[in-house]
Amino acid sequence: MKVRISENTQRMLMLLKLDARRLFERIKYRAPEYMYDFSLKRSRDHFPEIFTNRYDSVSIKDLLLCGQEVLAGLDQFYTKVDEMRWYLNHTQDMPNRVEDKIHAHIRELEKFYETLNLYIDVEMGLIAESSSATEADETDN
């Protein structure tokens, strides 16, 4: 039996889901633009705009509203985001190498994003928990 979650929890989960979506979309779909600026100007000034997110300012108290699976999914997703941000801000690699690595990071980030969405949807009751196990297995393969 699924326990009904509070309205505050639903709101927090929706905010986290939307934040992850917007961040992922900026990272993935603006990659050609920010990589062009990086390779042409060797400037890192535009990266804060790409990687800005609300999760960085969420309190532990607010995160306590989330279930364990969602917390694990958030950690996995935002750790990869932070790894990408760190790499782009500190790399000495040549632009072609940077672009290859970023594309690999984006592919991995997409899997983490899909998993996070799955966990949030299950916790919000948008999909049944039994179907989520099947989808998670498919995501891993």
Q: Language-model segments: which ranges?
A:
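Eukaryote-biased recognition of C-terminal alpha-helical segments
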Residues: 138-141
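Interfacial alpha-helical end/capping and short helix-turn segments at domain and membrane boundaries
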Residues: 17-135
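Hydrophobic/aromatic-rich structural module bridging two neighboring secondary-structure elements via a short loop
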Residues: 6-10
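Membrane-embedded hydrophobic alpha-helical segments
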Residues: 1-4
